[in-house]
Amino acid sequence: WLARSEEDIEKIFNKQLERLQTDYIDMYLIHNVGSKLWKFTEKYNVLDFLTKKKEEGKIRHIGFSFHDDYEFFKEVIDKFPWEFVQIQLNYIDENFQAGVKGLKLAGEKGLPVIIMEPLKGGRLASTMPPAVDEIWSQMKEKRTPVEWAFRWVADFPEVTTILSGMSSYAQLENNL
């Protein structure tokens, strides 16, 4: 992180508002929460800072993106009155990081959940192993690998939004 003090956090936040040309941010996300970076969050009182900014009307909703194991996810989700979370989830990584268990826990707490990496960095968007193709070919519904990956994530009622990176118009159309 670029901040090395509580004062730096204030400066960085004000610079973000300036770059966005706004007086407030609707959804402010602490990125890359994990056990190592969480120490920084605690050391520099980041949660107190964000609470203050919310009270001032400069932040509307506070959330975090998570990159650690499920046990740490349980700790973080109970440390603050979060308003949304972002986790990695796809049909290969259902037990990776927060995983499906984290998704379910966030849902139990009534938190909107944003999913990142539904295509595992594009690896689930291309050719599948023959065994997978064989199973999919037997399905009544015919879908592309991208459609299967999105459908798997979207079928969880706890999922609010699915993010997907794209580098071409064709990928954009396929993601819709």
Predicted stretch roles:
Residues W1-D8, K36-K39, V132-R143:
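Active-site mouth loops of central-metabolism enzymes
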Residues W1-R4, I30-S35, S65-D69, I87-I92, ...:
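Active-site beta-loop-alpha junctions enriched in small/polar residues
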Residues E6-L17, Q21, W38-D48, D68-P81, ...:
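Distinct, well-ordered alpha-helical segments
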Residues Y24-L29, K58-G63, E83-Q86, G110-I114, ...:
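Structural preference for beta-strand elements that scaffold enzyme active sites
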Residues H31-K36, F84, M128-E134:
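Active-site-proximal beta-alpha loop/turn segments in soluble metabolic enzymes
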Residues L47-R60, G102-E108:
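Surface-exposed amphipathic alpha-helices with a cationic face
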Residues W82-F96, K140-E141:
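Acidic, His- and aromatic-enriched active-site or binding-groove loops in soluble protein domains
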